[in-house]
């Protein structure tokens, strides 16, 4: 759990913004959303594999774009 120390004479909205930023860096909200509902192990593996395939396709597209010369 991210903890922030409120500085002297620090406005509440600034402290809240720092807290939100630290929560985002820690990945708390994404973890909560991921654990909100039970996901079967097969579904989890399927989603991870689809993500890897998509990542690979994007990487290959970027590499092919680099090799193309536009002159």
Curated annotation (Swiss-Prot):
GO cellular component: ribonucleoprotein complex; ribosome
GO biological process: translation
Molecular function in Gene Ontology: structural constituent of ribosome
InterPro entries according to UniProt: Ribosomal_bS21, Ribosomal_bS21_CS, Ribosomal_bS21_sf
Pfam families tied to this protein: Ribosomal_S21
Cysteines joined through disulfide linkages: none
Keyword Ribonucleoprotein in record: yes
Keywords: Ribonucleoprotein, Ribosomal protein
Family to which this protein belongs: Belongs to the bacterial ribosomal protein bS21 family.
HAMAP family (alphabetical): Ribosomal_bS21
Name listed for the protein in its UniProt record: Small ribosomal subunit protein bS21
Organism of derivation: Wigglesworthia glossinidia brevipalpis
The organism's taxonomic lineage, starting at the top: Bacteria, Pseudomonadati, Pseudomonadota, Gammaproteobacteria, Enterobacterales
